[in-house]
Amino acid sequence: MKIYEGRLTAEGLKVGIIVSRFNEFITSKLLAGSIDCLKRHGAKEDNIEVCWVPGAFEIPVIAKKMASKGKYDAVICLGAVIRGATPHFDYVSSEVSKGVAHVSLDKEVPVIFGVLTTDTIEQAIERAGTKAGNKGYDAAMSAIEMSNLMKVLD
């Protein structure tokens, strides 16, 4: 039996990170977590590129643009969509998750979904580096593993 796994080293990887400016007090912490993870695993700062977008809904089109360039081993998508009193949350979170998945499949580049979709602001804060860890860090770990797995399978 042959088993394929991605190594957990970011040495030599080129990573694009897309960050939603909406809820920036949360997303900036997710970004810090992603960058921390990448650097701790050997990525050079010069190989990390960050692109800010207005909101989570704009993430998929920029993910497609970045994934299409052929220069990134992975694209990490970071945002925070917090439920409010209207159905807007459902529309945004659904379309962003579908859009990110489609880009990854279409471009055969790991496009990692690091967008928080929470019911409350407290839940978002917990997932941005307090009690529930930092989902930006977790997204970067997925990007590292998937990038290396894609290389193994090529």
UniProtKB/Swiss-Prot annotation:
Top-level lineage group: Bacteria
Active site: 88
Keywords in alphabetical order: Riboflavin biosynthesis, Transferase
UniProt-listed SUPFAM superfamilies: Lumazine synthase
Lineage: Bacteria, Bacillati, Bacillota, Clostridia, Eubacteriales
GO cellular component: cytoplasm; cytosol; riboflavin synthase complex
PANTHER family linked to this entry: 6,7-DIMETHYL-8-RIBITYLLUMAZINE SYNTHASE (PTHR21058:SF0), 6,7-DIMETHYL-8-RIBITYLLUMAZINE SYNTHASE DMRL SYNTHASE LUMAZINE SYNTHASE (PTHR21058)
Full protein name: 6,7-dimethyl-8-ribityllumazine synthase
Enzyme Commission identifier(s): 2.5.1.78
Binding sites annotated in the UniProt record for 5-amino-6-(D-ribitylamino)uracil: 22, 56-58, 80-82, 113
Role: Catalyzes the formation of 6,7-dimethyl-8-ribityllumazine by condensation of 5-amino-6-(D-ribitylamino)uracil with 3,4-dihydroxy-2-butanone 4-phosphate. This is the penultimate step in the biosynthesis of riboflavin.
Binding site for (2S)-2-hydroxy-3-oxobutyl phosphate: 85-86, 127
Originating gene: ribH
Organism of provenance: Clostridium botulinum (strain Hall / ATCC 3502 / NCTC 13319 / Type A)
Family: Belongs to the DMRL synthase family.
Catalysed reactions listed for this entry: (2S)-2-hydroxy-3-oxobutyl phosphate + 5-amino-6-(D-ribitylamino)uracil = 6,7-dimethyl-8-(1-D-ribityl)lumazine + phosphate + 2 H2O + H(+)
Pathway: Cofactor biosynthesis; riboflavin biosynthesis; riboflavin from 2-hydroxy-3-oxobutyl phosphate and 5-amino-6-(D-ribitylamino)uracil: step 1/2
Pfam families in UniProt: DMRL_synthase
UniProt-recorded Gene Ontology molecular function terms: 6,7-dimethyl-8-ribityllumazine synthase activity
Gene3D superfamilies on file: Lumazine/riboflavin synthase
Biological processes annotated in GO: riboflavin biosynthetic process
